[in-house]
Amino acid sequence: MSATAPIRIAARAQPAKYAFIIFHGLGDSGAGWTFLAEYLQRDPALASAQFVFPTAPVRPITANNFAPATAWLDVRSWLSHESVDLEGFNESMKLVPKLIEEQVAQGIPYERIWIGGFSQGAALTMGTALSFPHRLGGFLSFSGPPSYRWLEHTVSDANTGAPVFQSHGTMDEVFPSSGAEAVHRSFTSQYGFKNHRLKIYDGLGHSISPQLLDDALAFIKANLDAEKPAPRPAL
């Protein structure tokens, strides 16, 4: 399974101060998500953000009669999400720290690197939130899986204070919105995430919407420098 080189979009305002690494969903590509950079960079607060859009390797998809598609992990069934391709997931997860360290080498601190993804890409995003050993800037999870119980052995508390924006549609035909609510409960109650916002969109399917993008932008702007401690009051 050969991989396509990630698409990299430079910050409009240099030097770059922030970085976003965005993972696509099944059958998509990094190119399919470059619109997000264009949208976010329009805002002056994110003009100094640079973006990385990786593309998953092509692999046979079991649930699709082994037809090949770009995927971060195999899909074994469209009807059940309990059987997870851990081997494929863990292999794809190896890419995440490499991309993060590339940004650090370019002068972007961990605390200003955001990870995001859609569907399978959301699984990588939340897997990173649970396992990465350094505090990151934040996480964007769009239409992700209904459970991360299979990741419990990898849990780190380094990012429990990082901001998480999780979105889901009530008409999602792949992952029901009830699963999103369960994920939110587990991240806040079981794993101790303190700034985890779940936004459910009425009538939205396994997709994103203009309102969702506006909400994500507002959340990002409100949390861009969340790693900075509040200033002490003057004595």
From Swiss-Prot:
This protein's source sits in the domain of life called Eukaryota
Q: Which GO terms describe its cellular component?
A: cytoplasm; nucleus
EC numbers listed for it are 3.1.2.-, 3.1.2.22
Q: Where is the signal peptide?
A: none
Kindly report, in one word, the top-level EC class recorded for this enzyme. hydrolase
> Which SUPFAM superfamilies does the annotation name?
alpha/beta-Hydrolases
Q: Which UniProt keywords apply?
A: Cytoplasm, Fatty acid metabolism, Hydrolase, Lipid metabolism, Nucleus, Serine esterase
GO molecular function, a single term: palmitoyl-(protein) hydrolase activity
Localization per Swiss-Prot or TrEMBL: Cytoplasm; Nucleus
**What InterPro entries is this protein classified in?**
AB_hydrolase_fold, LYPA1-2/EST-like, PLipase/COase/thioEstase
Reaction catalyzed: S-hexadecanoyl-L-cysteinyl-[protein] + H2O = L-cysteinyl-[protein] + hexadecanoate + H(+)
Keyword Translocase on entry: no
Q: Which residues form the active site?
A: S119 (charge relay system), D172 (charge relay system), H206 (charge relay system)
Which GO terms are recorded in the biological process aspect for this UniProt protein?
A: fatty acid metabolic process
Family named by the database record: Belongs to the AB hydrolase superfamily. AB hydrolase 2 family.
**What function does this protein fulfil?**
Hydrolyzes fatty acids from S-acylated cysteine residues in proteins with a strong preference for palmitoylated G-alpha proteins over other acyl substrates. Mediates the deacylation of G-alpha proteins such as GPA1 in vivo, but has weak or no activity toward palmitoylated Ras proteins. Has weak lysophospholipase activity in vitro; however such activity may not exist in vivo.
Q: What is this protein called?
A: Acyl-protein thioesterase 1
